[in-house]
């Protein structure tokens, strides 16, 4: 990514030049991370299926176990890395995470068996804190009242990565199913080198806090979320949304391949379209939506759009109708930045890293539950023992969970007051 590309990122009102540049660095870091992840997304489930004698139900169960193992490692490691980022700074944690991700992709590119693939996912889970630390980085350099908008701008990197990544991954996977892993490894390692050379530290020594195992363990980190009733309510909203979100990576590839007969290339293009819609929402709609609707209404509309999108996914009888659900689903993108912005104002300045570590733990708990839950439901409802065939059952459950997020967001207290530094 060039300096010109960085300069093209929209300026954020109320931010100085150095702060805008720092957010630009984080934008590129997240973009390269998501590009790498997006490249292997259409391929990994099919690679597992090839190790499972092309049995879709068995591959779904194994893929769910892979996702659960990855989330377990992230759940244990993320609070530790969040606490370390509060103590030693964000930069070393981000660099370590990118290095680990690159090694993970190399291992998977060489994996001769499911066991080696599994080991690669374990390594990735341990070092997967770069996103949460990147959000803590943003909290360091962004005024509290501007954070939701900046989270939305940086969130566009997720969409851009998923525009390019799945399309490239699908095309490369058509040549060789291992090739996307090699390219993803190269991108991740280049990202680590990029950060080593140009990424400045965002947390000055005077704002750092001591590392405490009590807060760094997963239970201690999550305990922060119970310190405030509004924070706890937002954590419930985020937890339900995170569990629902797991339905997409857990079953999207296997579902569309099984129900509509899509190839890796077509799946990659569909995921790229998801990325296009996400980038439009995150990059163009989040700021105006937050300004016009307010954070709570943005949550309600966003999570509600996601629930409707899941309903379309579950019931669409043809692939053409499934495509209609994609832009509806991506309205969900206006809800996440609103929730993140509200939560950062409910903790002190020296707890931002701990908050992001805690929220990563919440996400990890969701990802512990979600992959196995959704793939098991999918495998059951396409199996011979199901009372009726319903391959879209995982998406129906995800829609119910997002409806819970809507209900809690609509009834929770406001989050306008910022907690003073303690």
What are the residue ranges of the model-derived segments?
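Short amphipathic helix-loop junctions that connect adjacent transmembrane helices
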Residues: 43-60, 250-267
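Conserved MFS/SLC helix-loop-helix module at the cytosolic interface between two early adjacent transmembrane helices
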Residues: 75-114
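Helix-to-loop junctions at the C-terminal end of transmembrane segments
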Residues: 77-89, 281-295
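Cytoplasmic helix-loop-helix junction between adjacent transmembrane helices
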Residues: 120-159
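A membrane-interface helix-boundary motif in multi-pass transporters
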Residues: 173-186, 376-400
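Multi-pass alpha-helical transporter architecture, strongest
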Residues: 192-198, 396-422
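C-terminal transmembrane helical hairpin of 12-TM major facilitator-type secondary transporters
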Residues: 296-339
């Amino acid at each position: 990514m060039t300096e010109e590309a960085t300069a093209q990122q929209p300026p954020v009102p109320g931010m100085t030049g150095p702060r805008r540049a720092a957010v630009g660095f984080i934008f590129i870091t997240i973009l390269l991370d998501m590009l790498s992840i997006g490249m292997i997304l259409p391929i990994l489930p099919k690679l597992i299926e090839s190790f499972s004698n092309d049995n879709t139900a068995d591959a779904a169960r194994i893929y769910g176990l892979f996702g659960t193992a990855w989330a377990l490692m992230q759940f244990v490691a993320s609070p530790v890395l969040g606490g370390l980022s509060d103590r030693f700074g964000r930069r070393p944690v981000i660099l370590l995470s990118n290095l680990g991700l690159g090694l993970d992709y190399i291992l998977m590119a060489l994996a001769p068996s499911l066991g080696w693939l599994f080991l690669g996912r374990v390594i990735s889970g341990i070092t997967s804190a770069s996103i949460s630390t990147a959000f803590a980085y943003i909290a360091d350099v962004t005024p509290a009242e501007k954070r939701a908008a900046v989270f939305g701008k940086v969130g566009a990197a997720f969409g851009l990565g998923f525009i390019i990544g799945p399309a490239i991954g699908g095309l490369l996977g058509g040549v060789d199913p291992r090739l996307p892993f090699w390219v993803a490894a190269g991108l991740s390692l280049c990202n680590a080198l990029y950060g080593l050379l140009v990424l400045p530290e965002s947390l000055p020594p005077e704002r750092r806090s001591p590392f405490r195992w009590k807060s760094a363990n997963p239970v201690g980190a999550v305990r922060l979320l119970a310190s405030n009733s509004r924070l706890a309510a937002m954590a419930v909203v985020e937890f339900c949304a995170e569990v629902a979100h797991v339905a997409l990576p857990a079953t999207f590839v296997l579902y569309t391949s099984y129900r509509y007969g899509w190839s890796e290339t077509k799946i990659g293009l569909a995921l790229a379209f998801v990325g296009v819609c996400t980038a439009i929402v995150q990059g163009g709609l989040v700021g105006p939506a937050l300004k016009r609707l307010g954070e709570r209404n943005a949550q309600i509309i966003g999570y509600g759009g996601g629930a409707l999108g899941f309903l379309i996914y579950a019931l669409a009888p043809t692939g053409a109708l499934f495509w209609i659900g994609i832009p509806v689903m991506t309205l969900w993108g206006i809800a996440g930045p609103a929730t993140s912005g509200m939560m950062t104002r409910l903790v002190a300045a020296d707890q931002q890293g701990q908050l992001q570590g805690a929220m990563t733990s919440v996400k990890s708990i969701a990802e512990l539950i979600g992959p196995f839950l959704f793939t098991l439901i999918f495998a059951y409802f396409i199996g011979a023992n199901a009372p009726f065939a319903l391959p879209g059952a995982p998406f129906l459950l995800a829609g119910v969970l997002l409806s819970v997020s809507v209900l809690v967001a609509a009834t929770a207290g406001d989050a306008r007051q910022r907690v003073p530094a303690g």
